[in-house]
């Protein structure tokens, strides 16, 4: 676990296991960014339209958000948690997340 994780009580997440168990990866980058490369099987729901696209994400699934660097995915996590999604993880940048799954 990282120093920041220890300081702020954040637990480490096994993204590979979550994906194997059926987690949905939501990539909140723009369609153009998504077309330039993405994680196989991920769903592209841009942050600016996420609120109107919530019906496309099952509430009974674990959700992992990702973007280019982790900023938009953090915002997306907040949107999803506020909408009642129970298990949501900020996977950060998509390339980093891809290396973890």
Regions found by a protein language model. Name each.
Residues 2-24, 31-62, 71-101:
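Rhodanese-like catalytic fold shared by cysteine-dependent sulfurtransferases
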Residues 67:
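Short cysteine clusters
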């Amino acid at each position: 676990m990282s120093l920041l994780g220890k300081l702020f009580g954040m637990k480490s997440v096994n993204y590979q296991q979550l994906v194997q168990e059926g987690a949905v990866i939501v990539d909140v980058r723009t369609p153009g960014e998504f077309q330039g490369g993405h994680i196989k099987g991920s769903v592209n729901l841009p942050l600016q339209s996420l609120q109107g696209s919530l019906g496309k994400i099952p509430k009974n699934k674990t959700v992992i958000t990702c973007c280019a660097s982790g900023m938009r995915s953090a915002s997306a996590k907040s949107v999803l948690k506020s909408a009642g999604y129970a298990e949501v993880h900020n996977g950060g940048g998509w390339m980093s997340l891809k290396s973890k799954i």
